[in-house]
């Protein structure tokens, strides 16, 4: 009798696990750049910010920075900030390439925090890393501009997180630890 109860319990757990896996498989993937519900855009003007990342171009003429999840540039001499890359995705940590022609940044546009690269003027943004679970951030260029080193974030129940340094070619790929 106890053996029958054990078999019924095991079969029940298997069925529940299978149904749960099917529900997760059929769940619609959320796209940060295509919100499903209604939303309203709000315009505002700021003259200061906090928790910003700032980088100066190698030629010393331009500053790139993030503010509220968008990336801007401004001349070092002052003037109006220009939006380089913005939208629904949260984009931060811009860094000029050694030759000043490209800017890398962290974006959640692909569903998780990954490293992206765009031209200095904000055009032709391209996702470099394709991480779907571990978050990538704090990207920096190699001196020759061919590689990017970024921190891959790991979390556990015992800590707030730890990181590993990963090397990626600017053409993409899996990267090396």
Predicted regions and their residues:
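Post-signal-peptide, soluble extracytosolic/periplasmic N-terminal scaffold domains
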Residues: 61-63, 81, 91
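Beta-strand-rich domains and repeat architectures in extracellular enzymes and scaffolds
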Residues: 39-72
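Residue-level signal for pocket-adjacent positions within structured domains
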Residues: 37-39, 79, 123, 173
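Blade/loop signatures of beta-propeller domains
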Residues: 22-43, 61
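Blade-terminus and WD-like Trp-Asp/Gly-His loop motifs, strongest in beta-propeller folds
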Residues: 55-61, 94-102, 139-147
């Amino acid at each position: 009798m106890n053996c029958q109860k054990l078999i019924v319990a095991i079969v029940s757990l298997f069925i529940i696990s299978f149904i749960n896996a099917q529900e997760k498989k059929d769940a619609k993937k959320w796209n940060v750049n295509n919100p499903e519900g209604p939303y309203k855009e709000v315009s505002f003007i700021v003259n200061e910010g906090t928790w910003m990342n700032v980088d100066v171009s190698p030629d010393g003429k331009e500053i790139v920075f993030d503010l509220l999840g968008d990336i801007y540039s401004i001349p070092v001499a002052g003037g109006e900030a220009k939006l380089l890359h913005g939208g629904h995705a949260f984009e931060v940590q811009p860094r000029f390439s050694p030759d000043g022609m490209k800017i890398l940044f962290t974006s959640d546009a692909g569903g998780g925090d990954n490293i992206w690269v765009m031209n200095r003027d904000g055009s032709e943004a391209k996702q470099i890393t394709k991480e779907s679970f571990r978050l990538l951030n704090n990207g920096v260029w190699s001196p020759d501009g061919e590689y990017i080193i970024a921190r891959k974030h790991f979390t556990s129940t015992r800590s707030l997180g730890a990181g590993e340094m990963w090397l990626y070619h600017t053409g993409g790929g899996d990267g090396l630890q």
